[in-house]
């Protein structure tokens, strides 16, 4: 993640901080921790961005809670998460973009999960690319795993769709192509999606 310059200022601003926010370094300077009275933002040189706010208040609010519908609240939460993701990806100078993957709701809590996309193809790693947890309008936690990719120039054959579909069992309904981690590289692969009802 960005550690200096306007990319850092934009990222700090997305989380409600300024360039003058108190910070300290951890892990031999590879992690910069920004903090105020209600929240903490950790920026790791590896690209890991972690935000957490206390239960009582929040630095980042998606909307004014006075008079809003559930649908409008979700739209505002998505907009808030997207603004933060855009700032993080600019700060990290990545060549990827984010795509909403899942929305989980439980009472007042909403969790938004995003996939990382490279050239329009999902990149599947060991953990979700980005997760945002809102408690009503307040952003409680956010985790973003920024990565840069460099094409190797190699080619890899992915099983043709018709051949893959012919081999599908009844429970396997959809086909998806994605980059998956393999031997320290991300390689394209095709796999089946199962119906959630089965």
Question: Where in the sequence are the language-model features?
Answer:
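A short, surface-exposed interaction/processing loop segment used at functional sites
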Residues: 53-69, 138-160
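Short, non-transmembrane alpha-helical segments in secretory-pathway proteins
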Residues: 2-16, 67-107, 151-187
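Preferential activation on post-signal-peptide N-terminal prodomains/segments
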Residues: 1-79, 83, 87
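Generic hydrophobic/packing signal
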Residues: 73-77, 122, 139
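Exposed beta-strand-loop-beta-strand "reactive/processing" segments of non-cytosolic proteins
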Residues: 8-47, 95-138, 144-147, 177-198
């Amino acid at each position: 993640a960005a550690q200096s310059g306007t990319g850092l200022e934009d990222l700090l601003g997305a989380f409600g901080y300024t360039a003058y926010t108190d910070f300290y370094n951890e892990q031999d300077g590879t992690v910069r921790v920004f903090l105020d009275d209600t929240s903490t933002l950790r920026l790791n040189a590896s690209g890991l961005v972690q935000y957490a706010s206390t239960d009582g208040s929040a630095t980042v609010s998606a909307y004014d809670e006075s008079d809003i519908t559930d649908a409008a609240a979700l739209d505002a939460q998505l907009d808030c998460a997207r603004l933060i993701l855009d700032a993080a990806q600019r700060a990290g100078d990545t060549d990827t973009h984010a795509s909403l993957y899942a929305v989980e709701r439980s009472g007042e809590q909403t969790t938004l999960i995003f996939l990382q996309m490279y050239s329009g193809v999902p990149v599947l790693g060991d953990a979700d690319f980005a997760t945002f947890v809102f408690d009503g309008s307040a952003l409680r936690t956010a985790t973003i795993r920024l990565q840069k990719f460099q094409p190797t120039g190699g080619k890899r054959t992915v099983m043709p769709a018709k051949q893959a579909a012919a081999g599908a069992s009844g429970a396997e309904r959809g086909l998806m192509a994605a980059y998956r981690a393999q031997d320290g590289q991300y390689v394209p692969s095709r796999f089946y999606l199962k119906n959630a009802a089965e």
